[in-house]
Amino acid sequence: MYKGHAVAAIAATSAHAAEEALALINVQYEILPHVSTVEEAISEGAPLLHSQYKNNIASHDVLELGDIESGFSQADLIVEREFRTSTVHQGYIEPHSATGWWTPSNKITVWGSSQGHFQIRDRTSLVLGVPVSDIKVIPMEIGGGFGGKTTIYLEPVTALLSKITGYPVKITMSRSEVLEATGPTSGSYMHVKFGATKEGKITSAQADLKFEAGAYPGSPVGAASNCIFTPYAIDNLRIDGYDIVNNKPKTTAYRAPGAPIGSFAAETLIDELAEKIGMDPLDLRIMNGAKQGTTRASGINNPLIGCIETFQATKDHDHYKSEKATKKIGRGVASGFWINGSGAACAVANVNFDGTINLTIGSMDIGGLRPVAAQHVAEVLGIPVENINPQVGDTDTVGYTSMTGGSGGAFKTGWASYEAAQDVKRQMLERAAEVWETSLDDIKLENGFFIHSSDSELKMSFSELASHLPDTGGPVVGRANLDPRGPGSAFATHLVDLEVDTETGKVTILRYTAAQDAGTAIHPSYVEGQIQGGVVQGIGWALNEEYFINESGGMTNSSLLDYRMPTSLDLPMIDALIVEVPNPLHPYGVRGVGEVAIVPPLAAMANAIYDAIGVRMTELPMNPAAIRKAIKGA
């Protein structure tokens, strides 16, 4: 167990009464030997969390390419360091909340905000032993998720309490419950090593990654292993990833899970390599950058990607060309990669008789997905996007759709919306042929108008044809369900200028530029918002955020007063530099954009701090106390 582990639930007629009842529960806990960090968990004599394992290492996986020893023997220069990162939380503003109603007819309805209501339904079914056909989950607006709302905490409990009481039951977590009881991301220990020639060619790379899983196995170390070296073409690689259990809340996904942690280590060493070789850090990246056909550590060959394009866009930007004002100002650059995901998706497009369309999708909207899906439909049909009314359907009204995560929403649900629109287009062309009593081959749809290819007098707008639907067979409904492959990889390169107060250790960010390959930017302002949001979370991770764990294993800073996330007062305007290398495997070239933006900031900040104070920072967070300690120890 861990502090925050759920042990009891109470239903009452008011929150106040429930809190009073909770206070009457007296549990006597015996504090057993426990382990809070990776290094404690794998130390000799550490208490064993799970008897089915011989130690606290739940799994050990290896990715290998080429021969690392041969690669290191070719190197003129080797750099290696140890790195540590603290446990951090996703920091969504809306706490977990769910309402459950076990009806007299023995059906369950759940209202909740999550990243995947079908997954909530399926997991609630599994926990309660109730068929999925008896459970309906109605998705509510979500106040932030970032991977943290991909699992169940409350939904089965609300249903059980409802069954007992006969009334709908709502549970909303307090902030301390969110921080202590729900999945953060991993703390870590890493040892990373690079070898390179004096000309700058990276010959070999090795990483030893040990990630906290929390109380049960399942850290993002596998994703970290797949991402850590992927921005570069390196012939000889070895990555050992260890999933390690410890007495903390079970980890869950956090925006590009695992990738920011690994990138912090790798990109810090890339910067150090460039310095020791005497090479511009972006030139080093350009020389070694991954491109189409480069083999990753996983053995996958890259499709068309925009990695080097982000390096070059950053180098060409006026931010990089500008001079720093004083020696106290540091400049740092770092790059990152995220895998991007996909999954099952469904979309249904109902044509109204006035020419508008009600579009129902199965993906939760956590980053602007509804308007993006609407844009796919509008583009196919040539009608204004304002004529599309997008909504997220519940589990009874739209086909199964996988959760919104992995930067896969716009790719899979955008594609499903595209295919649903194609279905609408096909049916509407048939209706136009019926109205004009002509061959389907004679009609085409251009810019929202149905046109007869040989009779210029025959022309109807989409809305005009929609008005004829009642007389030509009734409603037109376009449907699509798919599970598309090829979501496209995401790369980003970030540049930051900051000032360090050497007396206090305070870091002030002066300028931040984030270049990212977005494929085709379907909604550029939303793409910018996703990039900016990821950067802000990465800055918080780099400078402030961490779980403070006391000797008893409890979190001591489980409030937003003490768990310090950045606000607008801590940040400059983030300059989002959109690089467009369209994904050839999507109808409109879409790549996921939501996650990779959080990957480079940790190392970019560390490299800029080094540039300012001359000390390499190898532990997160780099708060004022840590910076003062580093300066004093230099």
Regions found by a protein language model. Give the residues of each.
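Structural alpha/beta core scaffold segments of enzyme domains
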Residues: 1-515, 571, 605-606, 610-613, ...
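Hydrophobic alpha-helical bundle architecture
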Residues: 526-527, 548-567, 589-592
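Cytochrome P450 core scaffold surrounding the K-helix E-X-X-R motif
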Residues: 519-523
